[in-house]
Regions:
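Conserved acidic donor-binding segment of nucleotide-sugar-dependent glycosyltransferases
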Residues: 269-280, 289-294
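A conserved mid-protein helix/loop that constitutes part of the nucleotide-sugar donor-binding site
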Residues: 150-173, 189-192, 281
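Nucleotide-activated donor-binding/catalytic signature segment of Leloir-type glycosyltransferases, i.e.
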Residues: 192-219
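Acidic anion/phosphate-binding donor-loop and adjacent secondary structure
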Residues: 128-148
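Aromatic "clamp/platform" in nucleotide-sugar-dependent glycosyltransferases that forms part
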Residues: 41, 236
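Carbohydrate-associated surface elements
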Residues: 107, 127
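Short alpha-helical donor nucleotide-sugar binding micro-motif in glycosyltransferases
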Residues: 30, 216, 222-228
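Membrane-proximal helix-turn-helix segments that form the acceptor-binding/catalytic region
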Residues: 54, 66, 82-100, 115
């Protein structure tokens, strides 16, 4: 494991591990390969790029992480100059030696294009594992009951960049607050702080129902999404957003933040499911519209489940294989 001076305790607290380099193993693998694919942009990848170039192997990459994902853990997520500097470092030392780069979303494609990345940029989703929608075709008998609690969920790691506080603040502006029961599904470094924020709404009487805060297995998340009324996604830094995509597989209507470097909003089928990032009032308005239109919400959920079929991981794999074939045909840079 590679250790970063000064920052290693913070990295450990986030639960991350960075690979170290065994040059003999790396050289053996690269000599064997027809194409060398970079999954990240760290120390191991710099060594791999240098060796692949030396051995004349074509290089490709997937853009999986924004600099802001790292910098936000250091309290520097909003330092645009620092994040741009890191991204340019990645570009100059890794990505510009690639023939092709997989961009999981349009948002990523546009960012790399605007920063003059030289590679062939290709929008290819990371893909979803196909999953059966277990939400029934017709709503249950009590679905239109004006007294029943409305389940609004947020699935995601409890960290600064996921921005659960905007969701929590939005509840103070919601006309349905007394009927809403929120569920924060996940864990992470900000779990205690976000739990306190959510519980304060309950103690202050804003919420009638006590918030549910828990970590769930994949099977449990499927059931949670299938039984929920709405799913909120506030992330300000997001390459793609697997959690919201998996929720939509269960015919759950989302309300998703749109921001400069958050790519998940592309999955919204229309503007009713998009709000301005870090704007709790706008989020509350979008939530309230959907909660006030249960029949439209149910039918729209079916369309969301159908839309996720386009992101089947098998389709993404086929597109990536074609990308590799093109890279081999073009040769190394």
């Amino acid at each position: 494991m590679y250790h970063f001076p000064i920052f290693q305790p913070i990295i450990d607290a986030q639960g991350f591990r960075y690979a170290s380099t065994d040059k003999k193993v790396l050289e053996k693998a690269i000599r064997w390969a027809d194409v060398v694919h970079m999954e990240e942009a760290f120390v191991l990848e710099i060594h791999a790029v240098n060796m692949a170039r030396k051995l004349g192997k074509p290089i490709t990459a997937t853009y999986h992480i924004h600099p802001e994902n790292i910098m936000s853990s250091l309290g520097m997520g909003s330092w645009r100059w620092a994040n741009n500097l890191l991204l340019k470092f990645w570009r100059n030392w890794i990505y510009n030696y690639c023939t092709h780069i997989q961009c999981p979303t349009i948002s990523v494609y546009e960012r790399l294009r605007d920063l003059n990345f030289k590679a062939n940029l290709r929008v290819i989703s990371n893909g979803l594992i196909p999953d059966k929608c277990i939400r029934p075709a017709d709503p249950p008998a009590k679905y239109l009951d004006p007294e029943r609690p409305l389940k609004v969920i947020y699935i995601g790691r409890m960290s600064v960049e996921k921005d659960q506080p905007t969701f929590i603040k939005a509840l103070r502006h919601s006309a349905f607050a007394k009927r809403i029961q929120i569920c924060l599904a996940g864990q992470g470094p900000e779990e205690k702080a976000y739990t306190r924020m959510a519980m304060k709404l309950y103690k202050d009487g804003v919420l009638k129902y006590k918030p549910i805060i828990n970590f769930y297995s994949r099977d449990e998340l499927r059931t949670l999404a299938a039984e929920a009324d709405l799913c909120v996604h506030c992330a300000t830094i997001e390459v793609e957003g697997l959690s919201i995509m998996e929720a939509m597989q269960q015919a759950l209507v989302p309300v998703i933040a749109k921001g400069r470097i958050s790519g998940a909003y592309q999955f919204a089928l229309d503007d009713r499911s998009i709000f301005r990032e870090k704007d709790p009032k706008d989020l509350a308005q979008k939530m309230d519209w959907w909660l006030d239109h249960p029949q439209e919400r149910w039918e729209q959920g079916k369309l969301y489940a159908k839309s996720m079929e386009e992101y089947d991981i098998a389709k993404s794999a086929a597109k990536l294989i074609e990308l590799f074939k093109e890279a081999v045909a073009e040769g190394s840079k």
